[in-house]
């Protein structure tokens, strides 16, 4: 289940709320997703109006899992705050695997860079460049960094992925984990529209080879059905970004 689902900032998923029957739902604030929350006054979802138009399959390839990224290093710049270094910027999901007590609340935040003291710099991945208090809706943070919260059910190994959003990052900050995590606690799952490869490039100059590799990872991180300007902050298909890169993109992918 998901008590908060915002595609551009993240999710809040209390596993204890799982049940066999239908669950009431509403858009709630972070304060309403605590393990001891009383949901007696929650309203049921409303039936949407009839769709207008023709329902058809999208003409472009689907978004698929195209690579698994392993954690290369874990640091603890502050007690209880763990930084997972994935070794590579990419767009997709974290996959969290934990065996923790009931009600354990684990929060993940994402960024492309670290501060000088080794802590996460989440300002590299804020939604819409919202870096200070603003007029957001229910549950909106003052700073719109990307984060996900998982509240454990506590019945053995639990695997969590924020299925209703995606993030772009190299570093993941984990708080709320009881004990010391391992590299197996968190993996990265790269997602992108499954475009076919049409060309490759390699030469004797390692700098040029590295630039080519970086370009290809950037192309794939920025194609979720449409080519975007960036996969974390704005995620829109701006024409300027497309025009300046389309030649290189089409030489690599269909």
Features from the language model and the residues they span:
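Extracellular/oxidizing-compartment recognition motifs
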Residues: 1-233, 240-241
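Well-ordered alpha-helical scaffold segments within catalytic/enzyme domains
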Residues: 177, 244-253
């Amino acid at each position: 289940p998901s008590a908060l689902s915002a595609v551009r900032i993240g999710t809040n998923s209390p596993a204890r709320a799982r049940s066999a029957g239908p669950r009431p739902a509403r858009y709630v604030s972070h304060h309403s997703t605590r393990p001891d929350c009383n949901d007696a006054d929650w309203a049921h979802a409303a039936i949407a109006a009839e769709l207008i138009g023709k329902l058809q399959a999208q003409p472009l390839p689907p978004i698929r899992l195209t690579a698994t990224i392993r954690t290369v290093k874990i640091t603890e710049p502050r007690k209880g705050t763990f930084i997972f270094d994935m070794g590579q910027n990419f767009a997709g999901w974290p996959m969290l695997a934990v065996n923790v007590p009931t009600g354990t609340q684990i929060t993940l935040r994402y960024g492309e860079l670290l501060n000088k003291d080794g802590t996460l710099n989440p300002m590299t991945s804020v939604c819409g460049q919202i870096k200070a208090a603003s007029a957001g809706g229910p549950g909106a943070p003052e700073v719109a960094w990307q984060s996900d919260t998982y509240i454990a059910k506590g019945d053995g190994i639990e695997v969590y992925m924020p299925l209703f959003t995606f993030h772009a990052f190299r570093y993941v900050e984990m708080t709320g984990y009881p004990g010391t995590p391992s590299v197996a606690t968190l993996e990265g799952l790269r997602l992108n529209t499954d475009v076919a490869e049409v060309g490759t490039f390699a030469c004797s100059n390692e700098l040029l080879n590295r630039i080519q590799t970086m370009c290809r990872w950037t192309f794939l991180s920025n194609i979720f059905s449409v080519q975007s300007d960036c996969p974390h902050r704005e995620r829109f298909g701006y024409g300027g970004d497309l025009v300046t890169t389309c030649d290189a993109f089409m030489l690599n992918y269909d």
